[in-house]
């Protein structure tokens, strides 16, 4: 139905993508496709999502930075209520951007989505009073396969989002 607008290789990091869906609004409200295999494949996101997850968090809650060791996952994330600052850190040891990060504000209002490929650490902090966060993944959850990185690790230097 609707095409998506894609920003590729965010902050020069290969594979990271910010997706802006086509939103069709009228006096009744709006409609948008949150995922369309053909549109995403055309945008270079050709993977099989096997699980959808949703979390709810209060203001200031920090989730992440998490990564999977033996069962890495591509992730497609979005916010359905509230606002978060979402961050991905490149953990690909052979990458020119190893250790580099990119962050984007995702909200119910801007409707942006963020594609995070395998072998990245990922996390978010809730900026609004409350947020509901949805994400698709390409592998099932393996509880003994998760690692983590501290947000304030001096080697990464993650900074807060700027407000205009």
Task: Write out the residue ranges for each language-model feature.
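Non-catalytic, conserved peripheral segments adjacent to functional cores
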Residues: 1-109, 128-130, 140-159, 163
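Conserved metal-binding segment of the jelly-roll/cupin
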Residues: 106-128
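Short, structured patches in soluble enzyme cores that scaffold and shape functional sites
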Residues: 135-138
């Amino acid at each position: 139905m609707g095409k998506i607008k894609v920003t590729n290789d965010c902050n020069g990091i290969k594979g990271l993508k910010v997706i802006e869906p086509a939103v069709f609004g009228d006096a009744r409200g709006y409609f948008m496709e949150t995922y369309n295999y053909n549109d995403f494949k055309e945008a270079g996101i050709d993977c099989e999502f096997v699980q959808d997850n949703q979390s709810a968090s209060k203001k200031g809650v920090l989730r992440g930075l998490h990564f999977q060791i033996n069962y890495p996952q591509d992730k497609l994330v979005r916010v359905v209520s509230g606002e978060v600052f979402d961050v991905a850190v490149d953990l690909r040891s052979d990458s020119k951007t190893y250790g580099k990060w990119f962050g984007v504000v995702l909200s119910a209002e801007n409707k942006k989505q963020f594609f995070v490929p395998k072998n990245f650490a990922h996390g978010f902090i809730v900026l609004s009073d409350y947020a509901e966060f949805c994400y698709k993944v390409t592998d099932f959850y393996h509880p003994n396969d998760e690692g983590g990185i501290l947000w304030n690790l001096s080697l990464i230097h993650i900074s807060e989002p700027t407000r205009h």
